[in-house]
Amino acid sequence: MINALIINYPWFMYLVVGLFSLAVGSLLNVIIYRLPIILQEEWKEQCCELFHFEQRKEKIKLNLFLPRSFCPHCKAMVKAWQNIPLLAILVLRGRCYQCDSPFSIRYPFVETLTTVLSLYASWHFGFTIQLLFALLAIWILISLVFIDLDHQLLPDSLTLGLLWIGLIANTQNVFVSLDVAVLSCAGAYLALWLFINLFYLMTCKVCMGHGDFKLFAAFGAWLGWMYLPIILLISSITGAIIGLIYLKINGKSRDTAIPFGPFLCISGLIAMFWGDSIINWYIGYWM
């Protein structure tokens, strides 16, 4: 029945993906905002226990689902209908109903980006098992991009989750065979680990965090070793160019830390969608 629906009414399937991804985009906004706060609270608790500090009296009681979404300015609870993606932004003209403070433009941007990438993935992969896993990867990568931009943090719950989902997908050879996925995952982590440690020995500077290792390893688990050079090359070039422009415009020193995770995420998506075309172009151009 589902196959008949896909064949006879593809527009309906795109509509389902579009509406569902809008809702997912709204959830991603919650994850992007709350997950770093939750992690920071956990780390503070662990520090208090480890060093026998007095327990903190004021604790932020927050998880990914409770309390309900609220205005970051006046803390007014968002009404149920105001959680409908994009609709509330349009009806309320992008402002809180209680204090009239403007919402961040990021909220509709994340929802729109999630929808556009999900629809493109549907067109690119078709309505197959590849699409199901690709959508999971896209949603996790969007979360990682904005969390890293805000906090220079790539949470293990997301990077390692992405890694394991990739390995699970490839137990069925969705993108590559399982043996290639496992070896590529281990090789990707080891390669970056060796490079960063050699760089530190020569310069006494840390140029990349361990979260980047895990994210790069996750791409190995998903796509195999063949795409890793593409991901590393594109992310390094774009990161260097955009980083230099950012430092120049803002008058920052060269020692200013710039998150590398967003460039890895974007490069990973490029490899997922157009990796074969890039490899074929390279072979045709040089061979």
From Swiss-Prot:
Entry's EC annotation = 3.4.23.43, 2.1.1.-
Reaction(s) the record says it catalyses: Typically cleaves a -Gly-|-Phe- bond to release an N-terminal, basic peptide of 5-8 residues from type IV prepilin, and then N-methylates the new N-terminal amino group, the methyl donor being S-adenosyl-L-methionine
| One function term, GO molecular function aspect | methyltransferase activity
UniProt cofactor(s): Zn(2+)
Per the UniProt entry, what are the Gene Ontology biological process annotations, in alphabetical order? Answer: methylation; signal peptide processing
Write down the Pfam families for this protein, in alphabetical order: A24_N_bact, Peptidase_A24
What does the UniProt record say this protein does? Plays an essential role in type IV pili and type II pseudopili formation by proteolytically removing the leader sequence from substrate proteins and subsequently monomethylating the alpha-amino group of the newly exposed N-terminal phenylalanine.
PANTHER family referenced in this protein's UniProt entry, alphabetically: PREPILIN LEADER PEPTIDASE_N-METHYLTRANSFERASE-RELATED, TYPE 4 PREPILIN-LIKE PROTEINS LEADER PEPTIDE-PROCESSING ENZYME
* Name by which UniProt lists this protein: Prepilin leader peptidase/N-methyltransferase
